[in-house]
Amino acid sequence: MISEIIEKWIKGILIDGITGNLSGLFDNVNAKVGEIASDVGSTPQAWNSGIFNMLRNLSETVVLPIAAAILALVMCHELIQMITEKNNMHDFDTSMFSRWIFKSAFAILIVSNTWNIVMGVFDATQSVVNQSSGVIIGETSIHFDRLIPGLEFQLESMTIGSLLSLWFQTLVVGLTMNILSICIFLVTYGRMIEIYVVTALGPIPLATMGSSEWRSTGQNYLKSLLALGFQAFLIMIVVGIYAVLIRNISGAADIAGAIWGCMGYTVLLCFCLFKTGSISKSVFGAH
């Protein structure tokens, strides 16, 4: 009689501990996954206007003069190349100066409007992301009371040893999920910081667009912008796949299997989020 009371008391403590661990197990991950859609669906200006204005000021006051000097050197080199390639001026054609003036004017126009060009790229990619968000993103929150109906009833039918093992597993998984929530934070915030850094240096690579020899630098920069912009679209696809996989766990009979399954899908989510950058760059040929 006393042993049954003690056993019931111990089981009650373990069940309360397990349900308490499960109730807050995925809270941080749910919050971070929920923030992904809003973070990747924001333009650089909307995400943090303070950082945006600071970097725009730096770009226009510090980077742009450097880009202007590079542009002058590039166009002088281009003029020399155009002259020398005509058999050291033996086949001199005055129309080459018209072409050089046109190329110089076009290059100056690009450099002076770098910020508008860069923001235009991100506005275009973000419109794609926002249009697709309603189709791709589903319910991504993990709630064990919904995934496993009758959770407490299942726990009461388990032995003390099984409950103790499950309680320890929830502690380990809880620690892992906190680490995974930090990984999700690193991907989303790291991408935005990379966008700001790349944007601030924009005038320098675009200053090479007027040169037939060095324009690959500017072309690769534009590819990098497109890769960063469409990385958001890939992130949305990954989160959408994650939402579908999580829903497949619904109705699982094995509580421990459901816990580790959810954690496995979340680990897979983090891995795929880290891969979106390299996949996007490979698609656009950026390096």
Where in the sequence are the language-model features?
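Alpha-helical transmembrane segments of multi-pass membrane proteins
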Residues: 224-236
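Hydrophobic alpha-helical transmembrane segments
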Residues: 64-77, 195
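Hydrophobic alpha-helical transmembrane segments of integral membrane proteins
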Residues: 164-215, 233, 237-243
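Membrane-embedded alpha-helices of multi-pass transport/permease systems
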Residues: 73, 118, 122-125, 183-186, ...
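Gly/Ser-rich, low-complexity
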Residues: 1-70, 83-95, 105-176, 215-220, ...
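Elongated alpha-helical scaffolds
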Residues: 100-103
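Short alpha-helical basic/polar micro-motif
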Residues: 77, 187, 191, 228
